[in-house]
Design a protein with these regions (language model features):
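Rossmann-like NAD(P)(H) cofactor-binding subdomain of soluble oxidoreductases
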Residues: 12-24, 36-113
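Helix-loop-beta segment of a Rossmann-like dinucleotide-binding subdomain
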Residues: 103-117, 169-178, 227-237
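NAD(P)-dependent Rossmann-like dehydrogenase/reductase catalytic/cofactor-binding core
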Residues: 4-5, 42, 187-246
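Short beta-strand "acidic-cap" motif of Rossmann-like dinucleotide-binding folds
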Residues: 29-35
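Eukaryotic N-terminal low-complexity, Ser/Thr- and Lys/Arg-rich leader segments
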Residues: 1-4, 26
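Rossmann-fold dinucleotide-binding core
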Residues: 77-154, 160
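Active-site-proximal catalytic alpha-helix in oxidoreductases
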Residues: 147-194
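Conserved N-terminal Rossmann-fold NAD(P)-binding element of oxidoreductases
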Residues: 7-11
């Protein structure tokens, strides 16, 4: 039996809804999912627990301002990107952060793990990792400095694939992963962006071997998601051919 992990969820998007659906039946939620406008905070029971902030990065300012001041140290930021300057400017640099490798179905029906590559750091790291595990997402607890490097890698992942997709007329990631020509361009993009990385943050520039290691890890993650997509597509096709409900 999965251990119950009491957390508060903020954000009703795909990830927030999927986490609520996974944790709610196990008693792992403390109060309702808090929505935009702060709706639901008055129903959250008192006490210290992680507050998983599942809003988009564009809504962070609003979500933090709506959070009761006494609960802000418990915030767990689930967004990608280099948030450190933004957090420090608001006195939130000591909060927990989570770096998620997963895919969420439209409507928040389910989450697909990205190979256990998700990472968590900060005061609520252990409980957050357990909550993610209860939802089927493997994660590891890492030191703050290591998290900064991993967060940069995830930001790089997003940047290179969006850039290449735009350059190829909006080609989906699954198509890029299967195209040898696209993979060659990806390696070039990664090397170019790593070369201009600020040395001061990590103390050195990434080596070419690290570039290739990172690229292979990223491709393995994408291939795992793409294989699930193809499997689901096959199930839908069989149901349609058999006259079953799709």
């Amino acid at each position: 039996m999965v251990e119950q992990v009491p957390v508060t969820l903020v954000g009703g998007g795909r990830v927030g809804r999927a986490l609520a659906g996974a944790l709610g039946p196990r008693g792992g939620l403390a109060g309702p999912v808090v929505r935009r406008g702060g709706r639901g905070w008055d129903e959250v029971p008192p006490g210290r627990r992680p507050v998983l902030l599942c809003t988009g990065a564009q809504h962070l300012e609003e979500a933090v301002s709506e959070c009761p001041p006494e609960r802000r140290p418990d915030l767990v930021f689930m967004q990608n990107g280099a948030l450190e300057p933004w957090l420090a400017a608001r006195g939130l640099e000591g909060c927990t952060r989570a770096l998620l490798y997963l895919s969420a179905e439209e409507g928040g029906a389910a989450l697909k793990d990205g190979g256990g590559r998700s990472s968590v750091t900060g005061p609520w790291a252990v409980v957050t990792r357990e909550a993610l595990g209860a939802a089927g997402i493997g994660a590891r607890e890492v030191p703050r400095r290591d998290f900064g490097r991993l967060a940069f890698e995830k930001l790089l992942w997003s940047s290179v694939f969006w850039c290449l997709s735009a350059g190829r007329g909006g080609a989906p990631v699954g198509e890029l992963v299967q195209d040898p020509g696209a993979l060659s361009e990806l390696e070039g993009l990664v090397a170019e962006l790593l070369a201009v990385r600020i040395r001061a943050q990590f103390g050195r520039i990434f080596e070419l071997a690290e570039c290739r290691r990172w690229l292979e890890n990223a491709l393995n993650f994408l291939r795992s998601l793409f294989s699930v997509y193809l499997a689901n597509l096959g199930i839908v096709k069989k149901r349609a051919e058999g006259g079953g409900q799709v």
